[in-house]
Swiss-Prot record:
Official protein name in the record: DNA polymerase processivity factor
Impact upon substituting residue 410 to A: Complete loss of sumoylation and enhanced viral DNA synthesis
Bias kind Basic and acidic residues: ranges: 360-376
SUPFAM superfamilies listed in its UniProt record: DNA clamp
Organism the protein comes from: Human cytomegalovirus (strain AD169)
Phosphoserine: modified positions: 413, 415, 418
Subunit field text: Forms homodimers. Interacts with host SMARCB1. Interacts with host NCL/nucleolin; this interaction is important for the organization of proteins within viral replication compartments. Interacts with UL112/UL113; this interaction is necessary for efficient viral DNA replication. Interacts with UL84. Interacts with the uracil DNA glycosylase UL114. Interacts with the DNA polymerase catalytic subunit UL54. Interacts with host IRF3. Interacts with host RELA.
Main localisation: virion
Length: 433
C-alpha cells in the first residue's frame, strides 16, 4: 500500500501575536470607528494595510514585518472589505485579547481563506477579494517638511476640538465652513493654523517644532479631516511629520510611526472661497428718472423716440405702451420717463419761444388739429382737477390761467367736437400692435 503524498500548504501569511496585540491595542480606538469604506490588504512583504477613504481624505495604517511572517514569497496580494457579513468590523475582531491564532491562505485569486482561533473556538471562512483597489503611496517630493512634537499635536487637538462640534447659525466666513488654513512662512520659519472664525495658532522653530524644508505656502483642508488625522497620529505618542506635497495635486501629508506600525493620512486641498465681485445687483441710474421729483421742469425730448409731430395711429400705441411721467406737463414738476418738449417748464423747453421761467406764449404756434390730438392723448391720463401740474421752477409754461392747459378744452379751440370730447378707455384700442 502506497503512502499518500502529503499536499503542500498554500502560501500563508500569519500574525506574530505578541507584537501584533501590542500594536492593535494602541490602535483599538481608531479601528473601532472603521466602517464600510475601509479595505484590508495582505501583502507578501509581509505587511498588512488598512486603508480608509473619506471625502478629501485617505487614511492608511500599515503593520510591518515585526507583526507578520509569511511561509512563501509567492503569496499573492489580497484585498478584502473590512466590513464582512455576520462578522461586522473584521479588524476589530482581531483586536481581541483572546485571539490565539490568525492566518490568511492564498488558495484562489478570487478570495482569501482566513482562519481565526481563540480558546475553545475556531473560525474559518473565505472572503471575496476586492480588485482594482489602489493603495496610496507616500511621495518623497515635498515643498514643506515640518516635524511636530507630540506635545504640539496635543495642543492642536485641544485647540481644534471645541470647533469640530456642529454649531447653529454660523455666519458666512471668508473661507468655507469647517476648514482650517495652514500657512507656512520661510523667513523666519513658522507654521500657522487658522480656523474659520479667525482663531489662529502659530509655531516657530524650536525644540518642539523642526523645519526641514521651508517654502512660503498656503493650504486649506477640512477641519474634521484634519482633526481625525491628528487623533490617528496621536496614538503613537511620538513626533508627527507634516508635509505639503505639490507633485500633482496639492496634498497635506500627516504621518506618525513607531517600530510596529505607521499611520499615514493624505488630505486633499479644499478650494479657497473668494468674494465674487459681481454678486451685487447693480442698478443703473437710467431707471431713476421715472416718477422722480425735481424743480425746474427740465424735460427730455421725445423727438428721439418718435416725437409728437406724427399724427398717425402709431403715436397712440407708442405712448400707451409705456406710462408717461406727468410731473412736467403742468410746468415745474419732476419729469417722467418719456417727456415731450412742448412744455418749457422752468424755462428749459427745447422749443425756445421765449427765454425765462414762464415758458412764453408758444402755444399760439400750435394748430387746432395738433391741440386736438394732444388733448385726445393726454386727457385720460390726468384728472380734470389739474393734478398734473406741479408748483415748481417759475410757474410752468403750459399751465396758463387756472388749470392744466390740455384739460381746458374750451381755450383757443376751433372745433366744437373738441369742446365736448370725453375720452372713454377701451381695452381693445389700447392693445399694442
Amino acid at each position: 500500500m502506497d503512502r499518500k503524498t502529503r499536499l503542500s500548504e498554500p502560501p500563508t501569511l500569519a500574525l506574530r501575536l505578541k507584537p501584533y496585540k501590542t500594536a492593535i491595542q494602541q490602535l483599538r480606538s481608531v479601528i473601532r470607528a472603521l466602517k464600510e469604506n475601509t479595505t484590508v490588504t495582505f501583502l507578501p512583504t509581509p505587511s498588512l494595510i488598512l486603508q480608509t477613504v473619506r471625502s478629501h481624505c485617505v487614511s492608511k495604517i500599515t503593520f510591518n514585518s515585526s507583526c507578520l511572517y509569511i511561509t512563501d514569497k509567492s503569496f499573492q496580494p489580497k484585498t478584502i472589505n473590512n466590513s464582512t457579513p455576520l462578522l461586522g468590523n473584521f479588524m476589530y475582531l482581531t483586536s481581541s485579547k483572546d485571539l490565539t491564532k490568525f492566518y490568511v491562505q492564498d488558495i484562489s485569486d478570487l478570495s482569501a481563506k482566513i482562519s481565526m482561533c481563540a480558546p475553545d473556538f475556531n473560525m474559518e471562512f473565505s472572503s471575496a477579494c476586492v480588485h482594482g483597489q489602489d493603495i496610496v503611496r507616500e511621495s518623497e517630493n515635498s515643498a514643506v517638511h515640518v516635524d511636530l512634537d507630540f506635545g504640539v499635536v496635543a495642543d492642536l487637538l485641544k485647540w481644534i476640538g471645541p470647533h469640530t462640534r456642529v454649531k447653529r447659525n454660523v455666519k458666512k466666513a471668508p473661507c468655507p465652513t469647517g476648514t482650517v488654513q495652514i500657512l507656512v512662512h520661510a523667513g523666519p520659519p513658522a507654521i500657522k493654523f487658522i480656523l474659520t472664525n479667525g482663531s489662529e495658532l502659530e509655531f516657530t522653530a524650536n525644540n518642539r517644532v523642526s523645519f526641514h524644508g521651508v517654502k512660503n505656502m498656503r493650504i486649506n483642508v477640512q477641519l474634521k479631516n484634519f482633526y481625525q488625522t491628528l487623533l490617528n497620529c496621536a496614538v503613537t505618542k511620538l513626533p508627527c511629520t507634516l508635509r505639503i506635497v505639490t507633485e500633482h495635486d496639492t496634498l497635506l501629508y500627516v504621518a506618525s510611526r513607531n517600530g510596529l506600525f505607521a499611520v499615514e493620512n493624505f488630505l486633499t486641498e479644499e478650494p479657497f472661497q473668494r468674494g465674487d465681485p459681481f454678486d451685487k445687483n447693480y442698478v443703473g441710474n437710467s431707471g431713476k428718472s421715472r416718477g422722480g421729483g425735481g424743480g425746474g421742469g427740465s424735460l427730455s425730448s421725445l423727438a428721439n423716440a418718435g416725437g409728437l409731430h406724427d399724427d398717425g395711429p402709431g403715436l397712440d400705441n407708442d405712448l400707451m405702451n409705456e406710462p408717461m411721467g406727468l410731473g412736467g406737463l403742468g410746468g415745474g414738476g419732476g419729469g417722467g420717463g418719456k417727456k415731450h418738449d412742448r412744455g418749457g417748464g422752468g424755462g428749459s423747453g427745447t422749443r425756445k419761444m421765449s427765454s425765462g421761467g414762464g415758458g412764453g406764449d408758444h402755444d399760439h404756434g400750435l394748430s387746432s388739429k395738433e391741440k386736438y390730438e394732444q388733448h385726445k392723448i393726454t386727457s385720460y391720463l390726468t384728472s380734470k382737477g389739474g393734478s398734473g401740474g406741479g408748483g415748481g421752477g417759475g410757474g410752468g409754461g403750459l399751465d396758463r390761467n387756472s388749470g392744466n392747459y390740455f384739460n381746458d378744452a374750451k381755450e383757443e379751440s376751433d372745433s366744437e367736437d373738441s369742446v365736448t370730447f370725453e375720452f372713454v378707455p377701451n381695452t381693445k384700442k389700447q392693445k399694442c400692435g
